[in-house]
Amino acid sequence: IGDLLINSQKYLEFIAPYFLREEIFKHYPRLCKISGMALEQVRESEFQVCKEITFISEEQIKQSTWLTAEKLVADIDPKDTHYVAYSKHFRCKIWSGDKVLMNGLARKGFTNFITTDELFKWRQNNEPRP
């Protein structure tokens, strides 16, 4: 995953909800523990991984898009509302391996997903952007 984020800027543009930065910050202690890294090392790793991601505030998305996204994920995983709303608003794919989410939304006609394996294959088979 790190390779895709760090080495794909010539091929892809990554966007994410701004709250994702806050989520990473909240989990610094756990990240230090499971990685065995000091806080400064975790912060540096975060910088390297996140520097190619454009973080966008949710205020840019229309209320109607939020409502549509909420309805789609209500019985699957309401915590994924942000990702569906961003995908619909920016007309982009959701990078995910969450099979429950992907299958649940596919049953409702929403199939705008790409997996890590698909991203690697796509990058391998495409030319860099100018």
Please describe what each predicted stretch is.
Residues 1-2, 42, 80-82:
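A generic local structural motif
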Residues 9-10, 18-67:
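PIN-domain endoribonuclease scaffold, especially VapC-family toxins
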Residues 29, 70-75, 125-130:
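Short, surface-exposed amphipathic charged segments that create phosphate/polyanion-binding patches used
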Residues 4, 86, 104:
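Hydrophobic/aromatic ligand-binding patch that stacks against planar heteroaromatic rings
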Residues 54-99:
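Active-site neighborhoods of divalent-metal-dependent phosphate/nucleic-acid chemistry enzymes
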Residues 1-16:
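Short, well-structured N-terminal submotif of metal-dependent ribonuclease cores
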Residues 15-17, 89-93, 99-130:
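Acidic, PIN/NYN-like endoribonuclease modules and their adjacent C-terminal/linker elements
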Residues 1-3, 28-30, 108-111:
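Short, glycine/charged-enriched secondary-structure capping and boundary segments
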